């Protein structure tokens, strides 16, 4: 493989630098990720945050906010749940709390939350996160214009051929998942519990139970599934790893990378974060090469959980295959 170097370029000047957001499963891991030099920490609590490695208490979120800001970094808190009316009735005290601890961003996907934020004059910056539904530049621009959204989380099912067209129209920065488990379906219904009831099975439904679905025609397929107070969550067959695609992403304006640790617990996730930080620094210095990308990618594969597999997801798909 030829050792080509690349020049750092961020399309349309959306971001002055590459931003790495990482999830966290504990206060100790927050400290380790800050030491690793990630830019943002992504956390939340049980009632309003979806698919988090850990549900923190309000006291823990306060402590995390202090740690993040003392390190000169930013805090994003998940408020991206699909809301029922009773959740909306109780959301104001939580938004008050997030403003009090000075959360830098909150992720929001429900129109009702945007309404409350605007109606009551909250100063919280928002990131539009409607999961698998965020596939259109114009959709994102709508929320930027009408709800004051600062950034957006892109769906993971967008092929690169379609992805690279988006910055020409996008008016705000967009986050791309570059590592970790990728959700492909969320239902508010208790699908696992319904299955257990039908089959008379008594079993756990949690993420830690490590349940998965397999296609009848492909017994090797592995779609992770778990159920919690927000319903049922199903994930892609393989986890995502875009280390070898980072230069392409940056050169097309995608300078906000997300690292998802939902199925990569403990120290290994921190080590993987360090690898992406190294890639970020090399790219920004104009010293990143295809050989380095290959070496770093191999290191990620060694740290990734042995019972899970990595690929580039929909990145190289023909757009006609996913319409």
Predicted features, each with a name:
Residues 137-138:
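Conserved nucleotide-cofactor-binding alpha/beta core module
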Residues 3-4:
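Intrinsic-disorder-associated, low-complexity terminal segments enriched in Asp/Asn/His/Tyr and depleted
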Residues 146:
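Acidic-histidine catalytic/liganding microenvironments
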Residues 12, 16-132, 153, 160-323:
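Active-site pocket-lining/capping segments in soluble small-molecule metabolic enzymes
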